[in-house]
Amino acid sequence: MGLPKEHRLKHWRDFKTIYSQGKRFRGDALAIILLPQPAAPTKIGISISRKVSKKAVVRNLIKRRIRHACRTLLPQIQPGWHIVIAVRYNARECEYEHFLQELKRLLIQAEVFHGH
């Protein structure tokens, strides 16, 4: 099960805008780029390069794990943000729990996580 439709970033223009104007935070396996969008619900997109893995099966597995972590954390993320999660090379060895912890840490660092 993926993210709810109203929380998905889909269009390449949105990704391009976020990459060019957003604020970046880096971790071991993930990087997040954030751009405030005050009148909109929080939307999340995932970007993964072939440099992470040549195999689509591996890339899709990583994306599914990250989407699950996003779905878990979504109720605690402040509304009004567009977020791109860029997967880094080290993500190949990571499990769901690692993605969940790292994503939470990056969101706290970016000050968009409720309660921190």
Curated annotation (Swiss-Prot):
GO terms for biological process: tRNA 5'-leader removal. The keyword tRNA processing applies. The keyword RNA-binding applies. Gene3D superfamilies: 3.30.230.10. Its EC number is 3.1.26.5. It catalyses: Endonucleolytic cleavage of RNA, removing 5'-extranucleotides from tRNA precursor. One of its GO terms (molecular function) is 3'-tRNA processing endoribonuclease activity. Keywords: Endonuclease, Hydrolase, Nuclease, RNA-binding, tRNA processing. Transmembrane segments: none annotated. InterPro entries: Ribosomal_Su5_D2-typ_SF, Ribsml_uS5_D2-typ_fold_subgr, RNase_P, RNase_P_CS. One of its GO terms (cellular component) is ribonuclease P complex. PANTHER family: RIBONUCLEASE P PROTEIN COMPONENT. RNaseP catalyzes the removal of the 5'-leader sequence from pre-tRNA to produce the mature 5'-terminus. It can also cleave other RNA substrates such as 4.5S RNA. The protein component plays an auxiliary but essential role in vivo by binding to the 5'-leader sequence and broadening the substrate specificity of the ribozyme. Belongs to the RnpA family. Consists of a catalytic RNA component (M1 or rnpB) and a protein subunit. This is Ribonuclease P protein component. It comes from Picosynechococcus sp. (strain ATCC 27264 / PCC 7002 / PR-6). The gene is rnpA.
